[in-house]
């Protein structure tokens, strides 16, 4: 069953996605639910499909994805990163094209922690001169 299955791990913010890719007709299953059912927003679905549209393989593979942590945007970004890595395992010649689009690089931005004495990470209490 697992013949010619490709794997990629993607991360974004606090989300982690495990992406399993095998030959098929373009079905994307996320946490045992269809992509249109899992992501209500069209923008999140577009983010997930970006690397596939770039290399024109939207209808060539089926994806079985498990994603944990974070919110909708972070999970979509993690899935995109995982799909990109799985595509590179499948065909290393796609790396240049994917890198040029910016999909290979892990987005290292995370939420900055709240500091003691401040309201948020950087928001300071109101200053009174007198």
Curated annotation (Swiss-Prot):
Domain of life: Bacteria
Keywords from the named record: Ribonucleoprotein, Ribosomal protein
Alphabetical GO biological process terms: translation
Gene Ontology MF terms: RNA binding; structural constituent of ribosome
InterPro entries according to UniProt: Ribosomal_Su5_D2-typ_SF, Ribosomal_uS9, Ribosomal_uS9_bac/plastid, Ribosomal_uS9_CS, Ribsml_uS5_D2-typ_fold_subgr
Assigned GO CC terms: cytosolic small ribosomal subunit
Family according to the record: Belongs to the universal ribosomal protein uS9 family.
The protein's name: Small ribosomal subunit protein uS9
Species: Colwellia psychrerythraea (strain 34H / ATCC BAA-681)
Protein encoded by which gene: rpsI
């Amino acid at each position: 069953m697992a013949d010619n299955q490709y794997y990629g791990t993607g991360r974004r913010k606090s989300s982690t996605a495990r992406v399993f890719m095998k030959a098929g007709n373009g079905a994307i299953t996320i946490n045992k639910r269809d992509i249109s059912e899992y992501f209500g927003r069209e923008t999140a679905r577009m983010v997930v499909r970006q690397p596939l549209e770039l290399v024109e393989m939207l209808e060539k593979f089926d994806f079985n994805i498990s994603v944990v942590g974070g919110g909708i945007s972070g999970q979509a970004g993690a899935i995109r990163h995982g799909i990109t890595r799985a595509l590179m395992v499948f065909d290393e010649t796609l790396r240049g094209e994917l890198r040029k689009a910016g999909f290979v690089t892990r987005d290292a931005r995370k939420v900055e922690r709240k500091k003691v004495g401040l309201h948020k990470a950087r928001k300071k209490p109101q200053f009174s001169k007198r």
